[in-house]
Amino acid sequence: MSNPIIDIAALRKSYERAELNEDASHADPLKQFDQWLNEAIAAQVPEPNAMTLATVDSKLRPSTRVVLVKGYDARGIVWFTNYNSRKGLELAGNPYAALQFHWVELERVVRIEGVVEKVSAEESDAYFNSRPLDSRIGAWASPQSEVIASRSVLVTNAAKYGAKFLLQPPRPPHWGGYRLQPDNWQFWQGRKSRLHDRLRYTLQADSSWLRERLAP
């Protein structure tokens, strides 16, 4: 028996878990992000550190993908990847990017915009060396974003580099970290009747943050 056709347009949810107001939110968006991320972790949201990364190519065509945040502080949000991947090449041509976290279970979204730079070689080395061995070999084995004939290419490459490096693969020169330095944050909390809470933080010339409420 075939499944009934789902009416996508009729799918909707009422958001009633929480609220976000100026008095209860932090004046510093990094502190607000830290609070929300830790609440997502405590709520056992699947992969709470997963975020969508948006970049733009030389023809102004945007692209997105999901990456994992591996660190954050006053300097920005950090993730690691292949510098020769599509996102790496696009960031080399246009360093401005946007991030989005969507914690469905908490009815929350965080959007972050800013300029991106590579982290230091020392930071990349430290994180690379903390990864499981198969992940380190995988960084060598996968020519990310390139066309390959079949999955066997990856399997063969992994075996080759595993035999070459044994237990001590060095960090590939084409692999490392990026840091997005935020100049704009938005925090969205779902509310009843689609009257959601939405706060925007904009970086000012004196390095302070302007907090404003936006209509949802």
UniProtKB/Swiss-Prot annotation:
GO terms for molecular function: FMN binding; pyridoxamine phosphate oxidase activity. Pfam families: PNP_phzG_C (PF10590), PNPOx_N (PF01243). Belongs to the pyridoxamine 5'-phosphate oxidase family. Its cofactor is FMN. Homodimer. Its EC number is 1.4.3.5. It catalyses: pyridoxamine 5'-phosphate + O2 + H2O = pyridoxal 5'-phosphate + H2O2 + NH4(+); pyridoxine 5'-phosphate + O2 = pyridoxal 5'-phosphate + H2O2. Catalyzes the oxidation of either pyridoxine 5'-phosphate (PNP) or pyridoxamine 5'-phosphate (PMP) into pyridoxal 5'-phosphate (PLP). GO terms for biological process: pyridoxine biosynthetic process. Binds 1 FMN per subunit. PANTHER family: PYRIDOXINE-5'-PHOSPHATE OXIDASE (PTHR10851:SF0), PYRIDOXINE-5-PHOSPHATE OXIDASE (PTHR10851). This is Pyridoxine/pyridoxamine 5'-phosphate oxidase.
